[in-house]
Swiss-Prot record:
GO BP field: phosphorelay signal transduction system
Protein name per its UniProtKB record: Uncharacterized protein HI_1651
Organism phylogeny: Bacteria, Pseudomonadati, Pseudomonadota, Gammaproteobacteria, Pasteurellales
Superkingdom of origin: Bacteria
Species per Swiss-Prot/TrEMBL record: Haemophilus influenzae (strain ATCC 51907 / DSM 11121 / KW20 / Rd)
InterPro entries for the chain: HPT_dom_sf (IPR036641)
Length: 92
């Protein structure tokens, strides 16, 4: 599946994000070793689009992600590829 995404995605960062929004708070969250704000967020993108648009996109991401995770748990490679592309679009 590495060839599916065009942009590089840190698996550790993706896992942390998914845990942050979809894991029971009692479960542990992977700690990020790198706390540099500029490496966690694209500050130029935030400045370009504005805080309200970024928050709106994050809200949409939270709403759609549980359905996408359900789709990813199925053993259908084509559907998995399509779901990964949907996640990429929502996360952009």
């Amino acid at each position: 599946m590495d060839g599916i995404l065009r942009k590089l995605i840190s698996i550790k960062d993706l896992h942390h994000c998914l845990q942050k929004f979809f894991v029971d708070e009692r479960e542990s969250i992977i700690e990020m070793n790198d706390n540099k704000l500029s490496e966690q967020f694209d500050l130029a993108l935030i400045e370009t689009h504005g805080k309200s648009k970024i928050l709106k996109n994050l809200s949409l991401f939270k709403q759609t992600m549980s359905n996408y995770l359900t789709q990813l748990s199925k053993d259908n490679m084509k559907e998995t590829e399509n779901t990964v592309h949907k996640i990429k679009r929502v996360a952009a």
